[in-house]
Amino acid sequence: MSQYEKLLRAILSGTQDKNILFSDLQLVLDRLGFDCRIKGDHFIYTKDGTEEIINVQPIGNKAKPYQVKQVRNIILRYQLGG
């Protein structure tokens, strides 16, 4: 199982939202085909075919748990990563 698959599984499980590294969340979004633009400490991800814009910011080296949940909901809603 690749690192990406492990990260995707961790995000989809919903049990490790507090322990997801920001760089790992970025890796998953990049692999899912999201485009990123940066404005200050805000990383704004968009993808053709999705209505939502994902706006994430790091807290230290971790991703904010509520933002991991938002990413999970978008992955599930659009059936990405499978």
Predicted region positions:
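Basic nucleic-acid-binding interfaces
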Residues: S2-K39, D48-G82
